[in-house]
Amino acid sequence: MSNVFAGKKIAKDTIEEDYVGSGGIFDTDIYQAKIKTAYIGKAQSSEARNVTLLLDINGRELRSQTWVSNKNGDVTYRDKQTGEIKNLPGYNTMNSVALLVAGKNLGDLDTEELVVKLYDFEAKKELPQAVTCFTQLHGEMINVAVQRQTVDKTKKNDSTGDYEPTGETRDQNEIVKFFAGEKLVTISEVAEFIKSLGEKFDDVVDSGHLLKAIRKVPEEAGIFASKWLERNKGQIYDKSTGKKAAEGITSALS
């Protein structure tokens, strides 16, 4: 089966930059995970695509969905300030996974249609569904920086079709950074190491030697992970708006 990202026009800079910033809720930390399934999803109303990872962390499942293309199916956008063509952040994120795990860009991975059990929100249970999978990632290890967040509970407004805050909150997890499976280095740190050797990152990828280069990166090069842990480990990030509750207070006082 063809890879929908194969041949996509991407920006020259394909390296995700470093910014410190379902199986139950994980505390904020870095975890080693096995990739159970990696598959492509599509929006119902457009050509937008996402990639979902089902991860096994010590027998517990963590699901991560990342949108990698816009409604037209493009993976790039034009920066309004500079006019520069850049990759969408979601594409760079999933491209970093492909590079760290398989040593290839996302568009160069082999894909295969498989039937896997996925949660169906209408049926409210897991059902067998056919999805396009990145099978080269299946069974491989990766390290993930997981953030615990408090967010709004939402409910669909039948008149507008939009999902709006109910005034209640729930906790969820979000993966904010991926690292190599065997050591805590990001793809950006790998690229810097390759540059320090006088080589070009793209040349190393194209020659099929990226995984070998990752193995050679010294442990002390993994600066981002230690800084992220120092700043974030154990924290809960409140991203809720309190919108519904605020509206209720306003109504009561009016």
Which residues does each predicted region cover?
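Short beta-rich binding modules
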Residues: 1-254
